[in-house]
C-alpha cells in the first residue's frame, strides 16, 4: 500500500509528514486537493521543511491561479528562481496553456496564432482538439527543464483535484497526440510537401520537421518520468483536505484514482481544524467542532494506514517566509491544542 517509514513497534501511523522528510529516495512530491483547502500553504510549508534536509528543492505551481507569489510575497515566473532567504529552495509558476502555444506558434516572440499560415493553424487546431494536451505539453516542458537543473526534490503545488488527476494521464495523452500527427503526416504527406519549402518550412516560417522532433523528444522525457511517477521509492502524493463532506468525498475519489494510476499516497493533511477550549461559551465554535470531529473520525477510520496530519485554523493568513516557517513546524511536530 505505501512506503511510509514507521518503526516496527509502532501500532499506528505518525500524525506528521516526517516520513516524507526521512525518505531520502523521494524525487517527486505532489500536493493536491479540492480548491480552497490550503494546498499552496501546505506545499510551501513542506518545501521549507524539505529544504532543511535536502541539497536542493524546487517548488512548482501548476495552478493557473498561481498563489506561490502571494504566499512568499515574491514574484515568480516560468524560470526557476531562488526564494528570498533560502539558498537551496527555488520556485517557479508555469502557465498550463503557454507551452503548446510556444511550440506551435512559430519562433518569433510576437508571433501569435493569428499570424499562422493555413497549415500551421491546422496543426494548432489539431493539437488543441486532443483533451488534456495543453497540460501535457506544459508538464513536458517543465520536466525537460527540471531534468537539466538536477534538483534533488521537486514539489508540485497542483491545480484543484480534477486538473491534477487529468495531468496524471498526460503520458498517454502525448502518445495519442504524436500518433495522430504521424497519421496525418503519412496520409497527407504529398499534400503537405506542396506547402513546404526544401527545408520543411511552412508558409508562416514554422519548421514542421523541427516541431516533430521536439514532440518526439518530449515524448521520450515523458515516458521516462512516467516510470518514475509509478515508483513509490521516487514519488508520493500528499492529499490536502478540510473536515467537511465535499472535501472528504473529493479526497476519497482522488485516492482511488491515484491507486488506479499506480501512484503512491500515504499522507493526508487536514487543515482548518477548530480546537475550542473546554467550557468555551462560543456556541458556533463548539457546533462546528462537533461537525468537524465527525468527518475527522471518518478520515481516521478510512485511512488508518495513512499519516493524517491535523492542522489548526489560524487567526491570520499564512503569508510570508516567517509565518510559513512557523506553520511548517506543525507538519513535523503534531499540533497540541491549548488547554
UniProtKB/Swiss-Prot annotation:
GO cellular component term of the entry, any: GET complex
UniProt-annotated location(s): Cytoplasm; Endoplasmic reticulum
Protein's UniProt keywords contain Cell membrane: no
Active site: 63
Entries under InterPro entries matching the protein: Anion-transp_ATPase-like_dom (IPR025723), ATPase_ArsA/GET3 (IPR016300), ATPase_ArsA/GET3_euk (IPR027542), P-loop_NTPase (IPR027417)
Gene3D superfamilies per UniProt: P-loop containing nucleotide triphosphate hydrolases
Its EC number(s): 3.6.-.-
Alphabetic keyword roster: ATP-binding, Cytoplasm, Endoplasmic reticulum, Hydrolase, Metal-binding, Nucleotide-binding, Transport, Zinc
Residues that bind ATP: 34-41, 244, 271
Chief site of localization: cytoplasm
Keyword Cytoplasm among record annotations: yes
GO BP: cellular response to oxidative stress; pheromone-dependent signal transduction involved in conjugation with cellular fusion; post-translational protein targeting to endoplasmic reticulum membrane; response to heat; response to metal ion; retrograde vesicle-mediated transport, Golgi to endoplasmic reticulum; tail-anchored membrane protein insertion into ER membrane
A GO molecular function held by the record: ATP hydrolysis activity
Entry-linked Pfam families: ArsA_ATPase (PF02374)
Binding site for Zn(2+): 282, 285
Family: Belongs to the arsA ATPase family.
Role of this protein: ATPase required for the post-translational delivery of tail-anchored (TA) proteins to the endoplasmic reticulum. Recognizes and selectively binds the transmembrane domain of TA proteins in the cytosol. This complex then targets to the endoplasmic reticulum by membrane-bound receptors, where the tail-anchored protein is released for insertion. This process is regulated by ATP binding and hydrolysis. ATP binding drives the homodimer towards the closed dimer state, facilitating recognition of newly synthesized TA membrane proteins. ATP hydrolysis is required for insertion.
Oligomeric and partner information: Homodimer.
PANTHER family for the chain: ARSENICAL PUMP-DRIVING ATPASE ARSENITE-TRANSLOCATING ATPASE, ATPASE GET3
Protein's recorded name: ATPase get3
Amino acid at each position: 500500500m505505501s512506503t511510509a517509514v514507521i518503526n516496527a513497534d509502532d501500532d499506528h501511523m505518525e500524525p506528521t509528514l516526517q516520513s516524507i522528510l526521512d525518505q531520502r529516495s523521494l524525487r517527486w512530491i505532489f500536493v493536491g486537493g479540492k480548491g480552497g483547502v490550503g494546498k499552496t500553504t501546505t506545499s510551501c510549508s513542506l518545501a521549507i521543511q524539505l529544504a532543511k534536509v535536502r541539497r536542493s528543492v524546487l517548488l512548482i505551481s501548476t495552478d493557473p491561479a498561481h498563489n506561490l507569489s502571494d504566499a512568499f510575497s515574491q514574484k515568480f515566473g516560468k524560470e526557476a528562481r531562488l526564494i528570498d532567504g533560502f539558498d537551496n529552495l527555488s520556485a517557479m509558476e508555469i502557465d498550463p496553456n503557454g507551452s503548446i502555444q510556444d511550440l506551435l506558434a512559430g519562433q518569433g516572440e510576437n508571433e501569435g496564432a493569428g499570424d499562422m499560415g493555413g497549415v500551421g493553424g491546422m496543426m494548432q487546431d489539431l493539437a488543441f482538439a486532443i483533451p488534456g494536451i495543453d497540460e501535457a505539453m506544459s508538464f513536458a516542458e517543465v520536466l525537460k527543464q527540471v531534468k537539466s537543473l538536477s534538483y534533488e526534490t521537486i514539489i508540485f503545488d497542483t491545480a484543484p483535484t480534477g486538473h491534477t488527476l487529468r495531468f496524471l494521464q498526460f503520458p498517454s495523452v502525448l502518445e495519442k497526440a504524436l500518433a495522430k500527427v504521424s497519421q496525418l503526416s503519412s496520409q497527407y504527406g504529398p499534400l503537405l510537401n506542396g506547402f513546404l519549402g526544401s527545408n520543411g518550412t511552412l508558409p508562416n516560417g514554422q519548421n514542421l520537421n523541427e516541431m516533430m522532433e521536439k514532440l518526439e523528444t518530449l515524448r521520450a522525457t515523458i515516458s521516462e518520468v512516467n516510470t518514475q511517477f509509478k515508483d513509490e521509492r521516487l514519488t508520493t502524493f500528499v492529499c490536502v483536505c478540510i473536515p467537511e463532506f465535499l472535501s472528504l468525498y473529493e479526497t476519497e475519489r482522488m485516492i482511488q484514482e491515484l491507486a488506479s494510476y499506480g501512484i503512491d499516497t500515504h499522507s493526508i493533511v487536514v487543515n482548518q481544524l477548530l480546537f475550542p477550549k473546554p467550557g468555551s461559551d462560543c456556541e458556533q465554535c463548539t457546533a462546528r467542532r462537533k461537525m468537524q470531529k465527525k468527518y475527522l473520525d471518518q478520515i481516521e477510520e478510512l485511512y488508518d494506514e495513512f499519516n493524517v496530519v491535523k492542522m489548526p485554523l489560524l487567526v491570520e493568513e499564512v503569508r510570508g517566509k516567517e509565518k510559513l516557517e512557523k506553520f511548517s513546524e506543525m507538519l513535523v511536530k503534531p499540533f497540541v491544542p491549548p488547554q
